[in-house]
Regions:
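Beta-strand-enriched cores of mature, soluble protein domains
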Residues: 30-178
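Glycine-centered signal
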Residues: 4, 24, 29-32
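Compositionally biased, low-structure terminal segments
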Residues: 5, 15-17, 169
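Bacterial N-terminal signal peptides
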Residues: 12-25
Length: 178
């Protein structure tokens, strides 16, 4: 019996297998690749601010709020819990804190924020933020950006309550998990 044609396929099959193994071994899996881009997030929240006077010219507000955000893609439809401090010293105010957010399936992202120094009654305040961590598809998130806080244009319904309305613009980079 002759094995016609089988021998002529052994060498090309060997090379195909070798090339496929090398290519698949070199290409990083999708889970190790980085996702990165720009983002635009609209954020709205409500909460409380507890004031403590710590001297003749210094007042500190402890801020605690819950909110939600919508975005242009990444981090869309998130709920957030934010905490921070607003310090008013000698007619100059500045706020800083952090927010932890969760998406619809439970992935979390965390960022730190800090406002510019501003007048206490200033209606619109600018600031910066930095991504500092996350879980799930946001694990390892990094990046930063700016925000514009329009909260001073709104009046809360009750004393001691605060409302927030901010627009964030920035960048992110995170390992892909999909």
């Amino acid at each position: 019996m002759k094995a016609v044609g089988i021998a002529k396929w052994r060498i090309p099959a060997f090379w195909f297998g070798l090339v496929a193994t090398v290519v698949l071994g070199i290409v990083r899996p999708a889970s190790a690749q980085m996702l990165e881009g720009t983002l635009s997030i609209t954020f709205a929240a409500f909460g409380t601010a507890d004031a403590m006077t710590t001297g003749k010219e210094r007042t500190v507000l402890a801020i605690d709020e819950n909110g939600l955000s919508v975005s242009n893609g990444v981090l869309n439809h998130m709920t957030w819990h934010c905490s921070g401090l607003a310090e008013f010293t000698n007619g100059v105010a500045q706020t800083q804190g952090f927010c932890a957010g969760r998406d619809r399936v439970g992935n979390q992202a965390i960022f730190n924020w800090e406002s510019e120094k501003h007048a206490p009654d200033q209606k619109v305040v600018r600031g910066t933020f930095t991504w500092s961590g996350g879980t799930g598809k946001y694990a390892g998130i990094r990046g930063d950006g700016t925000y514009v806080d329009y909260s001073g244009e709104f009046r809360p319904l009750t004393e001691g309550a605060i409302v927030s309305y901010l627009v964030f613009e920035g960048s992110y980079k995170t390992p892909a998990t999909q």
